[in-house]
């Protein structure tokens, strides 16, 4: 699942930036904002970082732009800088930064902090895009009860089968192979390619090499046009294991 980062322009936050001291004239500020807007329209990441940094240096109390800068650093996997600017944005009242910070902690594998900030954000707004990552954080902590609760919520609206695949993995970790097969098949029904490999591996463990091979080959064929090289590697390794077992 693609990571979800919120970039919401809040007029109130812009006001905060305008009020802070700056040597910029009004015209210079408007020109800078126009350049930033155009860079976002072109998705020009190289220009965005220096432009938004310049804006934040001029207007350090603008919560919206602090959050934007955090997102830009997050996209560069510079989590320490992302964390710094998200915290500053939060201090100045940007609620979206709370959710973004939670995801940074997930990326840093600090799952307890991720859950803490996701829960803090959920008190403000019920953002369903966060459900999967809350479940994933609990799963990483092996708190399967809470993980299942959140993943089950996601199954009601998401379309890529990621949560069903995770429920399959949890069931398998709990030793419930029947339940795992059920969830992997549900994930496959939604087109999730990782579920093909996970179910194939489960069948290998059961000694059902025919079904394992069918799933791995079908999954590999479907993954031909995918950019996910890790997935393709998994299918190749699974097929190698099947051949070695026979």
Where are the regions that the model predicts?
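N-terminal leader/linker segments that initiate helical-solenoid repeat arrays
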Residues: 17-64
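Register position in tetratricopeptide repeats
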Residues: 41, 75, 107-108, 140, ...
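Short helix-capping/linker turns of helical repeat alpha-solenoids
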Residues: 61, 93-94, 125-126, 158-159, ...
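Canonical tetratricopeptide repeat
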Residues: 67-68, 100, 133, 166, ...
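Terminal, low-structured helical/coil segments at or just beyond the last alpha-helical repeat
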Residues: 205, 211-246
């Amino acid at each position: 699942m693609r990571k979800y980062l919120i970039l919401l322009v809040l007029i109130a936050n812009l006001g905060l930036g305008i009020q802070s001291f700056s040597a910029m004239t009004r015209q210079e500020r408007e020109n800078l904002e126009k350049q930033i807007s155009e860079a976002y329209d072109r998705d020009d990441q190289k220009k965005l970082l220096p432009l938004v940094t310049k804006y934040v240096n001029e207007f350090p109390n603008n919560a919206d732009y602090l959050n934007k800068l955090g997102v830009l650093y997050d996209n560069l996997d510079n989590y320490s800088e992302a964390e710094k600017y998200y915290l500053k944005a939060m201090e100045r009242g940007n609620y979206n930064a709370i959710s973004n910070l939670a995801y940074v902690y997930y990326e840093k594998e600090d799952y307890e902090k991720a859950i803490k900030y996701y829960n803090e954000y959920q008190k403000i707004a019920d953002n369903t895009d966060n459900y999967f990552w809350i479940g994933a954080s609990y799963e990483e902590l092996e708190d399967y009860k809470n993980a299942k609760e959140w993943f089950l919520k996601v199954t009601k609206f998401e379309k890529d089968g990621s949560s069903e695949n995770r429920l399959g993995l949890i069931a398998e970790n709990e030793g419930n192979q029947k339940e795992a097969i059920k969830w992997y098949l549900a994930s496959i029904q939604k087109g999730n390619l990782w579920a093909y490999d996970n179910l194939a591996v489960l069948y290998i463990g059961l000694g059902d090499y025919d079904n394992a091979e069918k799933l791995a080959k079908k999954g590999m064929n479907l993954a031909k046009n995918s950019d996910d090289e890790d997935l393709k590697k998994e299918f190749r390794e699974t097929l190698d294991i099947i051949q070695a077992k026979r």
